[in-house]
Amino acid sequence: MKRVFYHVFFPALCLTAYPLTAAEMLPTPYLPVQTTTMPDDLLSNSDYTNHWDWVKETWEKGYSTFSIKDKKYIANQEITLINPAFSKQVVTLLNESYSYNNTLNSVQLNIGDGIYDAAGSEAVNTTVKGEYTNSKGNIETGVLQLNGDGKAFHTLVENNGALTMNGDSQAYDTVVKAGGRQTVGGRAYAQANLIDGGIQVLSVTSTALAEDTIVQNGGQQIIYNGTAKNSHIGANSYQLASGLALDTYLYNGAFQQVFSGKGEEFVADRNTTVYAGARQTITSGISENAQVYGTQVITGVDGQWSDGDWVSDSNSNVRVNGQQAKDATIHAGGLQRIQTGNADGTQVYGTQLVNGQKGGWVGGSWVEQSGWTGGIRANATNTTVHAGGLQQLAWYGEASNTVIDGGRQEVLALGHISNTTLRNGGSSLIAYGGYSTGTLTVEDGSLTMEGGSVHDWTGNLGKGAWAASADLQGPSSVLYLKHNADTAESVTTIKALTHNGVVNFSAPEGRDAGQFNRLELTTLEGTGTFVMNTNLSGGIGDFLNVSDAVTGQFKVTVHDSGSELRSRAATPYHLIYANGSGADTFAMTNGSVDLGAYKYYLVHGADSDKDNWYLSPQANTPEPEPGPDPEPGPGPSPEPNPEPGVKPDLSESAKAVIAMANVTPTLWDAELSTLRTRLGEIRQMRDYEEGAWGKYISSRYRVSTEHVAYRQDVNGVMLGGDKRFDLENSALIMGSMASYTRADLDSSSTNGKADSYGIGLYTTWLHNSGYYIDGVLKANYFRTENNPYFNGGRTHAKDNTVGGGASVEIGKHIALETWFVEPYLQASWFIGDQTHYELDSGMSVKADAARSLKGETGLTFGKNVTLVDGTLLQPYARVAVRHEFMKNNDVVINHTEKFKNDLSGTSGKYGLGMTAKLNDRWSAWGEVSYEKGQHIETPYSGQLGIRYSF
């Protein structure tokens, strides 16, 4: 019978439990750790007497309460209320007597009594319920009461039934259904309990232990005193931990209230696991070492369990003092909400909210109300926030000795932190109206502080987000200043800043154009970097103010958002006031900063102005206007007046775009020069008929203008074919060609490239007298890429354009036996398309149509040499003078600044070459030349070609 009851009936009950995932599912009912001592052959054992008839007769005679003892038993009976007039219908078993497989219906069975121990008496397979009405019209409760050392095994407590345990009694394998109750008092021990809609109570005066308990289907476990160990609370079920709840598991939909009955310093809960969807509320006392995947709330706002749910007091008044969670772990997806009281030693992988705003549980959800709860503030101490975790403070929430170890911290308005450390990429945001005391240490991570004006909460401290002390310990420590557009000014205040990292006057996600910040410091020390922003064309930007003292040496990087900065507006901008600063206190990163088209330098004020620092287009110190020394803090900034007539230095980006505007004419010229060499070759080989040819070209240009100097390397290939037409006293050669050429730019300001794809037509007219005319018509498609240096990094731009041109050369071939001389005059013209593009730094570039008009006169002389094998060699030399007539290839930067790109001037040109006719079909040629002029030097220009005659 015992095996049938447990292995069939109990699993059926378990199947009615709330379904959960495999990882968070209520366990099957526990096996009892003890078994009954009742003999298996009790009903046939001659040592035991069936005493049921006597019990029944005694009740029928009007005796309501009596005992049976000394190896008596009652078995297989439905024991019901016989006389409704009885205040209680009770039978007590003593001295190795047994109740087996009985139903107690509105009657009471005691195992042991208050005077005599049960002495081995037990109740086995008992059902307890109440269905009968007593003489007062009330349902009479069925009761199984264990006294002394009495024991019960496999008990089912149904509606209006009760299992009451006193003394040192023990109960194993108990099921309590809805309307049933199990009371564990004294020093009793209850193990393997299934509270299936019923109630289990550990009484106020007890030191009892309930172990291996499952509470489901709206059941309740009330621990007034004593200990409940290894309890599993299911959906819509409740546990009150007033004594000690040890190793409790709360499943989806479960609720636990920790309310110490022994005062706020008493641990009422230890090692609870709160699964997703479950809730734990600590109202009084201490919860230790909770593992939270669901929600843990620490609050002095009370409430009540009603109809399978917890309902908080509607007015959110704090009625209870002293609630605390110690050493909890808030896992990913979990939440710890501190409304009042304290959480100490929390490990946060999920979310910790330290927020004293009114609110409570309504319908299973947390509903916030307006206003502060008042009284005890919410406080988190010794918290560690790991990667993926968040600590958020608001509404007078406080956190001290916090380590943000890869996680995030948000200190919203009315929030307060003290002695915080950021490491392993952790971040902290202090919003307008939040503040930090103690030291905020950034070992490796980022601190963001939001600016503002005076806040009602922190106005007595300073403007905006406020910190008493911040310590940026290294290069990976960053302070961001977030602009506040909702206040009249955006000021952030730190009393003492130790700065060995980076202070960035913008938010981590970037900065909106035209929004700037002011940082107010009392003292500054260290060797860090400030990254600041300006709009010099508008005369506005970030500002750093150090009111008392500064020690150390700092780097400054500046970004400018102005798009129309003009040279006449390139005046010094007041960037820093630092009381007591020296000439080496601040220095610009890389010596200068590119702001629009110009370079700016960070300069120290003169003796009368030595605490002020300016962005200036001149490296010398600007002279301020006469007047009193500037006062620290807010107020009109000094307006230095730079020396007139000094031209500001161009920025690296400006130099790069000016250089790129010169690329296409020189690239076109490199291709044209090699094509003219080809025409000279076919003039010298006068027996030429028709054929195809190809050549490789390589040139280097060194270009220097008023604004830029750079090197341009050109490499490419050309392919073509032509045919000779004989005329009267002359010949005409006509051909076409295609080319690909690449130019690489290299300078102190940029490395860029240009790819050229060209096609062309050419012709030569040769008169028998030696006169000739060469003509070339060529068109190109250019693809350019510019990568200028920009404030320690690079900016980029790509552009496409087209161009074309023509060349005419007139000369005479004069033969002097084996020698020849060719004087010539040549003119070439090129024009490129106007171009307009933008660097990704925001600089706008508009380049006029690139133009070139060149005239050249020169002399080629050489000798015909015939080798023994018939090979014809024609070594030659060339000298020439060339002049570029075009002066104004203008470039406009940021729609306002116009720069002339003047490559005009005269140059001398010298070259050596050789043409070889190898046989009737094949010939080859090569040439190398040097050219030097005012703006362009060509250290070498070389080509190698080969031709096949049909």
Task: Give residue ranges: language-model regions.
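Extracellular beta-solenoid/beta-roll
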Residues: 324, 347, 364, 379, ...
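Gram-negative bacterial Sec-dependent N-terminal signal peptides
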Residues: 1-24
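Membrane translocator/pore-forming domains, dominated by Gram-negative outer-membrane beta-barrels
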Residues: 398, 416, 436, 491, ...
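Short, T/G/N/S-enriched strand-turn elements that build extracellular solenoid repeat scaffolds
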Residues: 77-84, 91, 98-109, 122-137, ...
